[in-house]
């Protein structure tokens, strides 16, 4: 009995680090600003059959409607109530999405904005996505309800201007946003009620927006109030998966490690450093990636949520600066995402974006605020073209063959060791995942031609970067692995995608 009790305690302690994906699925995708009706369809027609584990959705709760500039993406990070009612859809549509995605084994993770309400400067009235009244100047949010008692004005009513002062970072206003007093049980209860409503609907977990701006103990107090996941889709006693947005590039008062007790943290150093390597800036080269992960100063793998770019830093917000790779840098981006999905470190998130007209002046995009593709503020449908790409300015990186097939690669090699590393002391590298998968990159300015140990059983394999295995045939390159596990690889430095990946399920 003692043994059983101990196991159940361990299970409880570890639950918030477990994404609760089904069938050994290992990656999630952020369908940034997508409507719930489009996500429900995408779960059924694409994400489930292609092996995606889940979707991070944009904040589902009512936000302020901003008209200057016109309907920016960041208005969704200015809540005014916890009603499920945004330009992505209403509560019925949200419930339908969660049910349909769960029914095909794809989980939903909610971007929870619980550090603050909207900016103090928003006018009083009903300029909100569901018509609820707000009076930020008087701290009135009657749809919750919150009043002046529920904010941190008595501790700090100014902006954060010193990130070396943890008190300021957590009690003052992030870019003018009214900071909630999360040490008050009333506020904790209101936040937990909102999150529990979503858990009961069937979500699997949460991204905690602006976690760095909340005290770890306050977050824990909220998490302690949360229900177990819905047993219709999750095993009894399952706790919500938690990943906290903590931007810690080093050199500030607050460290990501302070939040490990609550769940995983977003490892922003990952994309910033990998981008620098793939761009070959500062003398970095891919051969240095041999000890990628903790060896590069990243948080422990089982505490990391990793990504090449996110909705903030792909437009110069958040963290990472100019080294961040995005869909605008497609060739390098596919290499970076390929490396991420092949490497065992961290739990991976793929980005799915929309296009906007960039306008750089003095190195800054003046249009970094632009919201999703829309007609007069109504978000456009995600249409699917004949070639399986998306229309209406939705980028759908998760549908790019090279990325989609690497999501499948990660599923196939899950749990296998990082082995058979090879490099040329420059930017040609290769490694296997045990005997289940092998990947080789050429990021040099000259051709790669090498016979490498793949670790794979003998046979002919289909390269899943240049093509697909279809009905036992290969639409891309074929790789012949000998009885000694070796194969010859040739990759031109001018190839559209200068990398090759093969795995157990791509064997012909």
From Swiss-Prot:
Matching entries from CDD domains are given as: AmyAc_bac_euk_AmyA
**UniProt similarity note:** Belongs to the glycosyl hydrolase 13 family.
Record text on cofactor binding = Binds 1 Ca(2+) ion per subunit. Binds 1 Cl(-) ion per subunit.
Q: Please tell me where this protein is predominantly located.
A: secreted
Catalytic machinery residues: 209 (nucleophile), 245 (proton donor)
Q: Cofactors per UniProt?
A: Ca(2+); chloride
Q: Which residues form the signal peptide?
A: 1-15
Consequence of mutating residue 298 to M? Answer: In A1, B(A) and B(C)
Q: Name one GO biological process term.
A: carbohydrate catabolic process
Q: Which gene encodes it?
A: Amy2a5
Q: Which residue numbers mark the site Transition state stabilizer?
A: 312
UniProt: chloride binding residues: 207, 310, 349
State one molecular function term (GO). alpha-amylase activity
Reported EC number(s) for this entry are 3.2.1.1
What is this protein's record name?
Pancreatic alpha-amylase 2a5
Catalytically driven reaction(s)? Endohydrolysis of (1->4)-alpha-D-glucosidic linkages in polysaccharides containing three or more (1->4)-alpha-linked D-glucose units
Q: What's one GO-annotated cellular component?
A: extracellular space
Tell me if Ribonucleoprotein is a UniProt keyword of this record: no
Q: From the Swiss-Prot or TrEMBL record, state where the protein is found.
A: Secreted, Extracellular space
Which residues are annotated as modified residue Pyrrolidone carboxylic acid in the UniProt record? 16
Impact after mutating residue 64 to I = In A1, B(C) and AMY-2.2Y
Key word Disulfide bond present:
yes
Q: Which InterPro entries match?
A: A-amylase/branching_C (IPR006048), A-amylase_C (IPR031319), Alpha_amylase (IPR006046), Glyco_hydro_13_cat_dom (IPR006047), Glyco_hydro_b (IPR013780), Glycoside_hydrolase_SF (IPR017853)
Subunit (UniProt): Monomer.
| Annotated binding of Ca(2+), by residue | 115, 170, 179, 213
Q: Name one Pfam family in it.
A: Alpha-amylase
